[in-house]
Amino acid sequence: MKKIAVLTSGGDSPGMNAAVRAVTRTAIYNNIEVYGVYQGYQGLLDDDIHKLELGSVGDTIQRGGTFLFSARCPQFKEEDVRKKAIENLRKRGIEGLVVIGGDGSYRGAQRISEECKEIQTIGIPGTIDNDINGTDFTIGFDTALNTIIESVDKIRDTASSHARTFIVEVMGRDCGDLALWAGLSVGAETIVLPEVNTDIKDVAEKIEQGIKRGKKHSIVMVAEGCMSGQECADELTKYINIDTRVSVLGHIQRGGSPSGADRVLASRLGGYAVELLKQGETAKGVGIRNNQLTSTPFDEIFAESNRKFNSQMYELAKELSI
């Protein structure tokens, strides 16, 4: 292994820069040349590929976002398009590709490994949604979680002052981990997740019971994948006469300097990705399980049967929100 490339793809997440830094410096330490692909898979097509040096990743570990930039590239699903991308790697003698991103990014890496056996691919989970199988945590999840907690703590102050019910919408299309972990952390009265069928009438009854006990305000945490915050508010007011406000946290969840946990996770996974390439591994995603570094074949990561949901934590959150 003499040359590798690294790219960031899909939605950005805090800690991506730390992962790129770890990949770059681990590779250089092992006498491997590193190339940064700018603008994700689009950069592979456009040949926007540049050599990275030690200084290229200096002063990046604390920065949010990704200095390599990221872009959606739906045309990468087409075989002819992928051939062009593969040729851009081949002509530089690049033998390994590290892809930092989510599920869609992994699928692109798998295609490359299937269609060009001489290019090894390794995926690093970079998404705030924490929706990648094969790892307990994804890069960016902890930072986004802390952003939500800080925001909702402030929202609760004003909810308390005005005796209102706030519906807080957070990111999470298919995975409700942000809503679940944040909901437990801020003491949300109700958490609405895509993994659980929630009857809004039951939510209204729970809020009403709280009012009878003297509770003046409530927080309802909603993952965007099951319904919007406004839809939840509209449904609630069909069953109970309360003053509601909706707060959509939006892209603030993706930004900011990565937390210490995300910096450490990104550094460990980035270094491990290079070690796997050196060992000849390919078509795998790296992860952390029980604080141990692991790797999982892409096919297993994509399997719906392996999708994770912490039902015990959900039940605990319900018990503590009484």
UniProtKB/Swiss-Prot annotation:
Compartments in which it is found: Cytoplasm
Cellular component GO terms, alphabetical: 6-phosphofructokinase complex
Annotated EC: 2.7.1.11
Binding site for ADP: R21, A22, V23, T24, R25, R156, G187, A188, E189, R213, K215, K216, H217
Residues the record lists as binding ATP: G11, R72, C73, G102, D103, G104, S105
Residues binding Mg(2+): D103
Any one GO MF annotation of this record: AMP binding
Name of this protein: ATP-dependent 6-phosphofructokinase
Protein purpose: Catalyzes the phosphorylation of D-fructose 6-phosphate to fructose 1,6-bisphosphate by ATP, the first committing step of glycolysis.
GO biological process assignments: canonical glycolysis; fructose 1,6-bisphosphate metabolic process; fructose 6-phosphate metabolic process
NCBIfam families linked to this entry: PFKA_ATP, PRK03202.1
Organism: Staphylococcus epidermidis (strain ATCC 35984 / DSM 28319 / BCRC 17069 / CCUG 31568 / BM 3577 / RP62A)
Active-site residues (renumbered): D129 (proton acceptor)
Subunit structure: Homotetramer.
Reactions catalysed: beta-D-fructose 6-phosphate + ATP = beta-D-fructose 1,6-bisphosphate + ADP + H(+)
UniProt pathway: Carbohydrate degradation; glycolysis; D-glyceraldehyde 3-phosphate and glycerone phosphate from D-glucose: step 3/4
Amino acids binding substrate: T127, I128, D129, R164, M171, G172, R173, E224, R245, H251, I252, Q253, R254
PANTHER family: ATP-DEPENDENT 6-PHOSPHOFRUCTOKINASE, PHOSPHOFRUCTOKINASE
Cross-referenced HAMAP family: Phosphofructokinase_I_B1
Cofactor: Mg(2+)
Pfam families linked: PFK
Alphabetical keyword list: Allosteric enzyme, ATP-binding, Cytoplasm, Glycolysis, Kinase, Magnesium, Metal-binding, Nucleotide-binding, Transferase
Membership in a protein family: Belongs to the phosphofructokinase type A (PFKA) family. ATP-dependent PFK group I subfamily. Prokaryotic clade 'B1' sub-subfamily.
